[in-house]
């Protein structure tokens, strides 16, 4: 949700800054914040809690008791089983679900201000505020959905698989339907803003679907899975602007934007339906692929045939007879 928080902080302020000082000032401000954040990251972040210089004993104990990990100091790092990952149907269902999620994010991030300024006819300063509203809603609802998910897990009301698939209608299906409904509002500014805000806001439930599913499938390789899914999903950042630019190149009106919203709606809904049928919330067998292989390579145990066992039994009977 860091991207949503950044958008909420950036757009309302930069809209006015661009009107006052131009794009160069806005770009310089964003670049400065990014560099400052990078320096802070290198200074603060460590590989694991145990090596962090600022962590207290009580906090470290709390984390250690609640986080299960098989990694130990000096342990050999295992390469991800890429072949098994790429052959995994639940993994590709996750990739598609994440692609749909990223489409919604990048569509409103890149095309939202264009729609608000040129179709709804707002000035740039107000555009920044209005364009940030959907991301503020997403950030708030993500926290709420996260608490709901934790409660469900704690009470064991639903399995992980049921949670992931059960919240897909909220994170993907409903946002897609709301984008389609938005095309019926015409030039009604209030309804357009409300529906777009609610659409992306409900996508905050992605904290219980595509943003968590990589850890469900393979806790040992969750970073790799999410990295692949996010890489492919980020392609929407240049695909959706190309589509918007093509459809609005000759005329930037409601008819063209209706088509754009229908495309976004279709991607949302299709990705959710595919995950329903092919996704999973269970740990996959290839998560412990190397451990399974090692169990077969047992060292120091003598191979004994059934014939040898029979011979030993006969020898024992002879000794008892004597």
Positions of the model-derived regions?
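Flexible cytoplasmic loops linking transmembrane helices in multi-pass membrane transporters
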Residues: 53-107, 154-167, 171, 180, ...
